[in-house]
């Protein structure tokens, strides 16, 4: 679904919603118009995982809107119990769950390398040492640490990751980040996609954002 700038967002975030992705051409709008009110009224346990992705244009669609919203939901009456997963991970957005578990799947909200104040971690933003190591790898290590914590809190592990979406503001950083995954997974295959997106990401200075799904045996 999509909404034009200035319109009320027709977002259905009922108890069956498991995962949401906002794709926006306007980096200055962290939520569609109307969404903060809707979010504030939502019961905390019903919120799906959330990723906000900057894009240059809306793919094949041609319209004046600034935001597209993708919602993945369980069928009404599904036996899969939905619950939030809390591993003490800082989140970048208001009302953003760390992860949502439903049945044997866990949906991890898009992660960036942020501290408890919602800022990019200091190790990834030291302007005094711009060529000391890889800023992308520092971000990736922090993000994958958080993904691993969320997997453990949900009763699974990095070994059971079934889907990774990786977003870069500079696709030249793809391979350095992939090397981190290779090291963390011991060379095991990874269902992996990498996409270049326009800067900035929602957290100033961040250049890598990762969303993941995992299987819970």
List the predicted regions and their residue ranges.
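Extreme N-terminal basic, low-complexity initiation segments
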Residues: 5-8, 13
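N-terminal presequence-like segments and the immediate start of the first folded domain
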Residues: 1, 14-16, 23-145, 149-162, ...
């Amino acid at each position: 679904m999509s909404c034009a700038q200035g319109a009320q967002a027709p977002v259905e975030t009922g108890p069956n919603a498991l995962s949401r992705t906002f794709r926006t051409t306007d980096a200055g709008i962290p939520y569609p118009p109307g969404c903060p009110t809707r979010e504030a009224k939502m019961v905390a346990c019903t919120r799906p995982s959330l990723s906000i992705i900057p894009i240059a244009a809306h793919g094949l669609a041609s319209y004046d809107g600034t935001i597209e919203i993708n919602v993945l939901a369980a069928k009404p009456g599904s036996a899969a119990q939905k619950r939030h997963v809390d591993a003490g991970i800082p989140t970048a957005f208001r009302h953003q769950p760390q992860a949502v578990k439903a049945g044997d799947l866990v949906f991890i909200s898009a992660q960036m390398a942020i501290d408890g104040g919602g800022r990019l971690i200091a190790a990834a933003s030291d302007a005094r040492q711009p060529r000391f190591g890889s800023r992308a790898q520092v971000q990736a290590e922090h993000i994958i640490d958080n993904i691993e914590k969320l997997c453990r809190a949900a009763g699974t592990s990095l070994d059971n990751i079934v889907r990774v979406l990786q977003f870069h503001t500079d696709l030249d950083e793809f391979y350095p980040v992939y090397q981190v995954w290779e090291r963390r997974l011991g060379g095991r295959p990874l269902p992996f996609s990498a996409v270049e997106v326009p800067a900035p990401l929602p957290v100033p200075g961040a250049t890598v954002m990762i969303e993941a799904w995992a299987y819970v045996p």
